Amino acid sequence: MTYVLPSLPYSYNSLEPFFDEKTMIIHHTRHHQAYINNTNSILNGTHYENLLIEELISKLNILSIENKLALQNNAGGHINHSLFWKWLKLNTILKDDFKIILEKNFKSVDFFKKQFEKIALSHFGSGWIWLIKKYDNTLRIVTTVNQNTPLMGKEISGISGIPILGLDLWEHAYYLKYKNNRSDYVNAFWNVVNWDEVSYRFFNISNM
C-alpha cells in the first residue's frame, strides 16, 4: 500500500484569520507530504508495506524493521496530521451531549480550555497536545514528543488512549503567523475546533 496525502475538506484559506492560508498550504503539501513520502520509502519492499496506517501505528512496538525510529517519526507524522485536519473547521458549536462529558471530567468547559492551554504552553519543544479518551471513557489531556501519538501505546509514547482532539505544537504549524508566540496560536485554536468531529470521536470511536 502506498500512503497518499488526504485531501482537506475545506480550502486553505477557510480558517482565516486564525490559521493563515500560507501556513496551511505549507503544512499540508510540504510537511505532511514529506512524512508520507518518507514512510513509503522506509516500508517499500518490507512485509509491512500493505498495512493500513492505523494498523502500522498500533503495531510499531512489535515490528522488526530497520530505521524503526525514522518509521515511528514519519508514520506518526502521517496519522497525526490526517487526524488534525479533521479537527479544524470554523463556526461549529459545542453541543450539550459532549459539553456534559467535558464538565464531568473537567468541572467546566472553561477550566478544560485553561488546562489545555497551560499544558500546551508548558510542553518543551516539538510535539502534540491531545485530549484522549481512556478505555474507561474518562478524558485526559496529555502531550507527546515529536510525532508520537497515544495510538502507539504506552511502550512508545508513554501514554495510550484514543485521541479525540489534538493540536500540533511544532513551530511549523504556527511560526509564519504567530512567530514564537505559541500562546496566541493555542488561543486561536478554539476558533477553529471542529466540535462535531470531537464529539463524533468520543461517542463512536472505541479503537483504531
From Swiss-Prot:
EC assignment: 1.15.1.1
Protein name per its UniProtKB record: Superoxide dismutase [Mn]
Organism of this sequence: Buchnera aphidicola subsp. Baizongia pistaciae (strain Bp)
Free-text remark on how the cofactor is bound: Binds 1 Mn(2+) ion per subunit.
Catalysis performed (reactions): 2 superoxide + 2 H(+) = H2O2 + O2
Assigned protein family: Belongs to the iron/manganese superoxide dismutase family.
GO terms of molecular function: metal ion binding; superoxide dismutase activity
Keywords carried by this UniProt record: Manganese, Metal-binding, Oxidoreductase
Residues holding Mn(2+): 27, 81, 168, 172
Keyword Manganese assigned: yes
Disulfide bonds: none
A Pfam family annotated for this UniProt entry: Sod_Fe_C
Function recorded in the entry: Destroys superoxide anion radicals which are normally produced within the cells and which are toxic to biological systems.
Subunit structure, as described in the record: Homodimer.
